Amino acid sequence: MHSAHMSNADYIAKKYLRKDQGKKKKKKEKDFVEIQDEDVAGWDDDNSFSLVNRELTSLHDAPTIVANESLKDRDIDAIYQNIEKTTNKPAQLWKAVGNDEVVESEQQDSHDAESIPQFGLLTGKQVTFKAEERRKREEKSSNLDEEELRKSRETVYRDATGRRIDLVLARKEAKRKLKEKEEEARRQKEQQQGVVQVRQQKEYLKELERQKTVPLARYEDDPEYNKELKERSRWNDPAASFLTNKPVSSKATYQGYAPPNRFNIRPGHRWDGIIRGNGFENKWFQRQNERKAQEHEAHMWAIEDM
């Protein structure tokens, strides 16, 4: 009944209009992680990188102040030191994989001289130094290019098994084999020659050595030359039949002991010392000795009575 006599205004005020009770609701706890530092990549962990980051940021944000003084009045060395102190360029920290040593940048080495800022006019020493550095870099790069080009053009030779062949060693081996082949051919040629040809060749070489000491002028009455011509044997010499002072050519004979024979002929120098006869020479000498002994005994008996 009471609710039936309630006006519409009271009903709306009761259901929808509420007074502020002064109580605040508790904030719902955050279920996410809030990043307090903007350094997501972790650059601030390393002192060197964080220092560089802050300095570069400060340099970028700082206003550029240009003094009224002229660059000519300022010392170049002082400017360089100022720039090094402000920039504080970090050391190269790139490392090769698997190595603890720091690998320096090739670009930094090659362009180190050009990276130095130049202000105003350059002195003669600075221009000379810069030109010399550029010339050294160009020579170094050209030498590297020539070496790489030579290696790329070098032909690789391989044998049937696929093994690489060194041309220098192969040429040396070929020269050695050719020399051995020539030596063998010369030795075979000497063996094929006769004894007379070998002796004549040796005599010719000996004569050449002797001619080095003789005087240059030789005349027809030279006694040594005449003696040499007289001792030379000729096949059509008419006096060869009645000459008595013909020199006897000595032949190489055996120098050791050799058994005697009827004709008193010495064995040659190639004899090996083995007697291959049937013993006839020994029997012949034995018979001759017996005959001489009998004759001597008969003679002694004949004169015994005298």
From Swiss-Prot:
The keyword Cell division does not apply. Keywords: Coiled coil, Cytoplasm, mRNA processing, mRNA splicing, Nucleus, Spliceosome. Residues 130-152 are annotated as: Disordered. It is found in: Cytoplasm; Nucleus. It comes from the Eukaryota. GO terms for biological process: mRNA cis splicing, via spliceosome; mRNA splicing, via spliceosome. GO terms for cellular component: cytoplasm; nucleus; Prp19 complex; U2-type spliceosomal complex. It holds the Pfam family Bud13. InterPro entries: Bud13 (IPR018609), CWC26_splicing_factor (IPR051112). Residues 130-198 form a coiled coil. Belongs to the 40S cdc5-associated complex (or cwf complex), a spliceosome sub-complex reminiscent of a late-stage spliceosome composed of the U2, U5 and U6 snRNAs and at least brr2, cdc5, cwf2/prp3, cwf3/syf1, cwf4/syf3, cwf5/ecm2, spp42/cwf6, cwf7/spf27, cwf8, cwf9, cwf10, cwf11, cwf12, prp45/cwf13, cwf14, cwf15, cwf16, cwf17, cwf18, cwf19, cwf20, cwf21, cwf22, cwf23, cwf24, cwf25, cwf26, cyp7/cwf27, cwf28, cwf29/ist3, lea1, msl1, prp5/cwf1, prp10, prp12/sap130, prp17, prp22, sap61, sap62, sap114, sap145, slu7, smb1, smd1, smd3, smf1, smg1 and syf2. Belongs to the CWC26 family. Involved in mRNA splicing. This is Pre-mRNA-splicing factor cwf26. The lineage of its organism: Eukaryota, Fungi, Dikarya, Ascomycota, Taphrinomycotina. The gene is cwf26.
